[in-house]
Amino acid sequence: MVDTAVILMKQEETPSPVDIPWVFTPLIGLPLVERHLMSVRRVGIETAHLICGKSEQTCLEGCLSRWSHDERFPAVNIHGPGTNFVSILPECFLLMDGSHVYHPKLLEDAQLRNDLFIFTNTDKQPIGLGMSTPAFPLGHFPVIPSEDIVIREEMYTMNVHKAENRKSAERLILKTLRKETDGWFSIHLNRPISLAVSRHLVNYSIHPNLITVMTLFLGVLSGVFAAMGTYAFMAAAGIVFHLASIMDGLDGEIARAKFLTSRTGEWLDTISDELTNVAFITGLTIGAYRMSASKTMFWLGIVTLFFYFLTLILLYGHLATGTQSSSLLYFQEQIKTRQFQKRRAAPLITFLQPLVKRDLYGFIFMILAVLGLPHIIIFCWLAAVVITPILFTSHLLKSN
């Protein structure tokens, strides 16, 4: 693995008439140069050398103090015209063309290699990313046929020096903000909406944790509406609950876009999700009782809450003591492992998994609430929270 990157940020074309240097061109809420630096830091690069022209050098040097106090950045060295620093470079370093943006997995792959190579597109044209040595003149990417690596189509790279390419580059970056565990409803309904909102919010100084708190407020509001016990409020509760499900993606998208992900943020998001569910179940229990005057529905709601808390204790207790994760997505990832798929219950659990994804049940519960059927929601939730502890306990016993 390499720990040094050389990023070429030198102006090659006629400067544009804008007030800011091109290296500070905003791209999904971050200046281009900062996006490069945070991207390489995320994959393990500890030191970055920026090669720039005279027009960019002064502006970049003015940022050094701020970057040095932000853990999202590597140690940064700036080299203007006439600077000779080749002698201090390690034997191998990551060489990047700063006028391009790259798919995160391309950088991960590059950082893990120790051999001399260059990434090329399907036409065998260099894309401006590879591993070099001080033996090569800076700005000249090593082209050795046996070490050309053709990138897959989904691994995007795009020149953003040209203004007409930036919108396309932003769309490509937004796609990487999705999660691999997204369900069908999330991919086709929730994410398109949340990404459209995130695209605008990233341009403001809004911390992801603030979005999480706002989402929690919506979740609690859905419970308050449901507890009113009228058809109109029950319908509003379902709509607000699903809206909270859509907004639940915003905090993570903004955090990933601005490299602000943290374990604290993950736990806050997790707690927000569960409090939203508790508020909604509680509201449904009260609202269903008011709508039907049925004590049976009331006690079914109480039993649902009991088993829901039991499920939380089991799942989060395991996360806190047996894993480094703070999200229930950990269990979704475990289901995909080859070891888990060998188990007898694996087909059933794999089949049921989409039903416990928030994007799907949030949509279904919204429809049921709009139809004035809160008791059906309670029955569905009760079935889920009774089955989950049984399957999870069985899984733990077999693991031990």
List where the protein language model places each region.
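N-terminal glycine-rich phosphate-binding loop and ensuing alpha1 helix
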Residues: V2-L60
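Conserved beta-loop-beta/alpha segment of the NTase-like Rossmann-fold superfamily
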Residues: E61-L129
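A feature for the membrane-embedded catalytic helix bundles of lipid/isoprenoid biosynthetic enzymes
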Residues: Q125-P134, L138-S198, S272-N400
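Alpha-helical transmembrane segments of multipass membrane proteins
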Residues: H200, V220-V224, M366-I367
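Membrane-embedded alpha-helical segments that form the functional core of polytopic membrane enzymes
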Residues: P208-T264
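Hydrophobic residues within alpha-helical transmembrane segments
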Residues: F217, I239, L243, L268-I271, ...
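Basic, amphipathic juxtamembrane/active-site segments
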Residues: I239, L243, G252-K295
